[in-house]
Amino acid sequence: MEPHKKFLFLVVVGGRSPKANIELHDVRWVIGSKIEDTFDQLRNDWFGSYNELHIDSYKKIESIDGYKINLRNKENNEPKNKIFKKRKFPNKKLWFVNIGGYDPSSMQEKHEFGFVVASSPSEAKNKANSKWLIDSQKKHTDDIYTVKSFTDVDECEVIKNINDWEIELIPNGNHLEEKNIPDWFGYMRIDKK
């Protein structure tokens, strides 16, 4: 691994909020060379109490749907990848999709989420629906964001600026489906520096 190479991480964080009766969770996408580099950003983005703030799982995202994820720091004027400049790609974007659904034997709404590469919100929803919560009833899309850069989203709430990183999608030719399985899961406290 290159010493300062940055990666996109998808992180599930958990914690408490003063008026909540149960532990709450959120999903964040952050950038760092290693997961520990993202802790400050995760703490800053958390909406509840810092006490007992923790990571439940994370995954380093390197490729999605046959595209390599390349990160470019716009602030440092890093040049775009040569392959990206030479070829015209369809208007593909990286989307985060959160699918909800129900199981009649459970009180809670089930969720499955992750990234897909698609040209439009409807294509992103269709891809996610074809992969996730296959056996759930009343399946629906709870959240969908396009993640072009970490300062832009598609007609939804604003994603906080994360060091002005831009995402380049580079076809990697392997078309292997990257499994939506965490690299790590458990209980990792991040409430204290």
Model region roles, listed by residue range:
Residues S17-V30, E36-L53, S106-G114, I134-Q137:
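A cross-kingdom feature marking solvent-exposed beta-strand/loop segments within repeated
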Residues K139-T141:
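Primarily single-stranded nucleic-acid-binding OB-fold modules
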Residues M1-V12, A20-N21, N44, Y50-G101, ...:
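Intrinsic disorder/low-complexity detector
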Residues K80-Q137:
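Surface-exposed interaction/gating patches
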Residues G14-R16, S33, G100, S119:
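Structured beta-strand/turn binding interfaces of compact recognition modules in eukaryotic regulators
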